[in-house]
Amino acid sequence: MSKIPTRIVRESSDSELPITVRIGKSGVIDSVIDEIKDQLSSRSLVKIKLNRGVASGSSERMEIFSTLATKTSSVVSFSRGNIVVLWSGK
């Protein structure tokens, strides 16, 4: 996929964009992946929050974010701390 449009980056970093998926202590399971795919089919941006304790450090968080993007055929358009926004590319 090519470069992410500026408009998408701006929308992704907006704090008003609501968190629509939370990943808890069970981690990235199939039902979470399916929910993200469903949301990406109806909207272009999905904001996800990892609850405390899911990832121990920033490298583990980035690995989880990368895995989510790969499994949902999307792109990480924004990440900060335990928050990631995935873009469907549409």
Task: Describe each model-derived feature in a short phrase.
Residues 1-90:
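Positively charged, polar, low-complexity stretches
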